[in-house]
A protein has these predicted regions:
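Active-site neighborhood of glycoside hydrolase catalytic domains
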Residues: 1-95
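Short, solvent-exposed polar/charged micro-motifs at secondary-structure junctions
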Residues: 13-15, 52-55, 105, 146, ...
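Residue-level preference for long, well-ordered alpha-helices that form the structural scaffold
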Residues: 17, 21, 73, 111, ...
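Arginine residue identity/basic-tract feature
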Residues: 18, 26, 50, 82-85, ...
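Catalytic-core region of carbohydrate-active enzymes that cleave or remodel glycosidic bonds
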Residues: 37-39, 59-152
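Generic preference for well-ordered secondary structure
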Residues: 42, 49, 77, 110, ...
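Aromatic- and carboxylate-lined catalytic core of secreted/periplasmic carbohydrate-active enzymes
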Residues: 101-103, 117-229
């Protein structure tokens, strides 16, 4: 069991509305922390502020970050997660909402259907760069679409391809998340730490974000290497 505050905690309106939302959910979090006698982990569903939102980090109730990298894969890259770890290395993170299977991507160069390959890339990337996991989601399920006629044409940023619950439940990406889980359990991902490329190599190379994402065991006897392409 995990307490997850809200959804899009801060909202997307700057200034006072944002401040009010952050403050209001903070009060909810403190109340949950006070009333929960079981030490249940608590987090908040971050807004999509690529790479990471900037609130709650140092607060005692905030046990781990539930990030939202969002639903367009072109900008998402390992340097986001590496930069987060350098700044907030003691606060665990999970990639909580990125590239739900079958969603309509939000990208400047046009909408695409999110494939299993796209979500697999960000899932492995997040874990290989120090994340504790990835939260899988699928269009048609989270928005409760039983029939194509259920789609609201006036509020339909993410389901432009007519994805229903029946199609989404058998999405190949869901099965592949099972492979991901078994792989990391078998290889004890908790014993691995991210391998960080040299600062200079990462900053000057135009291909830096295409480098393999690698983790190594603390005794340097094992390595897990992921190539995103």
């Amino acid at each position: 069991v995990v307490w997850t505050l809200s959804g899009e905690v801060a909202g997307y309106f700057p200034g006072k509305p944002r401040e009010t939302a952050i403050k209001g959910w903070r009060e909810v979090a403190k109340y949950v922390e006070k009333m929960d006698g079981y030490g249940t982990l608590q987090t908040a569903h971050y807004t999509n502020e690529r790479p990471f939102a900037d609130y709650y980090y140092d607060e005692s109730w905030f046990d781990f970050v539930l990030n939202q990298a969002g639903h367009g894969d072109f900008p998402i890259n390992p340097s986001w997660y590496r930069a987060y770890r350098k700044e907030h290395g003691t606060k665990p993170f999970i990639e909580g909402e990125s590239l739900y299977e079958y969603c309509s991507t939000l990208e400047e160069n046009g909408t695409r259907l999110c494939t299993d390959a796209m979500l697999r890339r960000v899932a492995y990337m997040a874990v290989q760069t120090g994340g504790c996991g990835y939260t899988y989601g699928a269009q048609g399920i989270w928005d409760n679409i039983w029939e194509v006629s259920d789609i609201n044409p006036d509020f339909n940023a993410f389901n432009k391809f007519g994805i229903t619950w029946a199609k989404a439940i058998d999405g190949p990406g869901g099965a592949q998340m099972g492979y991901l889980k078994r792989f990391y359990e078998e290889h004890h991902f908790e014993e691995m730490v991210p391998y960080e490329p040299a600062e200079m190599e990462e900053s000057i190379s135009p291909f830096a974000n295409k480098l393999a994402a690698a983790t190594i065991s603390r005794d340097k006897t094992r390595a897990l290497i992921y190539y995103g392409e």
